[in-house]
Each structure stands twice: as C-alpha cells, then as structure tokens.
C-alpha cells in the first residue's frame, strides 16, 4: 500500500460522513474490524483513524470506541 493510501481511505470515510451515510454520534467499527473490512493492515487503519481525528471528523473515547463527531471541520 502506498504511503498516501491511508489519506484516500480517510477521504472515503469523510465522504461517507459528508453524505450522511455516517451520522454524528455513530460508532465506527473497531480499527481491526475496519482493517479487515477494507482489506488493509491494522497499522493503516490506525493511520486512517488518526487522520479522521486530526480533521475533527471523529472523536475517540478510550474503552468506548470512535464516533463520528457532532461537528466537522471541512477543509481541515
């Protein structure tokens, strides 16, 4: 997988959020499940989730999971 592939995957999830397929407060799958579903390494899934967090699209709650943020920062 190329170094920027995680950015494309993050863009894909961001589009799902923008289009309303993932709604505020909705829980994303655990990173390992996300990796399995997308056919990627767990480390790549970790990078995708970190990028979504950096963009303000998701929030992580230790022991509870990762959720779509109530407000997104478009263009971040």
Question: Model segments located where?
Answer:
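N-terminal basic, amphipathic alpha-helical segments
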Residues: 1-76
């Amino acid at each position: 997988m190329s170094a920027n592939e995680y950015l494309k995957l993050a863009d894909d999830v961001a589009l799902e959020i923008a289009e309303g397929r993932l709604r505020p407060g909705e829980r994303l799958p655990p990173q390992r499940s996300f990796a399995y579903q997308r056919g990627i390494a767990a480390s790549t899934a970790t990078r995708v989730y970190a990028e979504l967090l950096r963009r303000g699209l998701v929030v992580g709650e230790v022991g509870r999971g990762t959720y779509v943020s109530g407000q997104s920062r478009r263009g971040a």
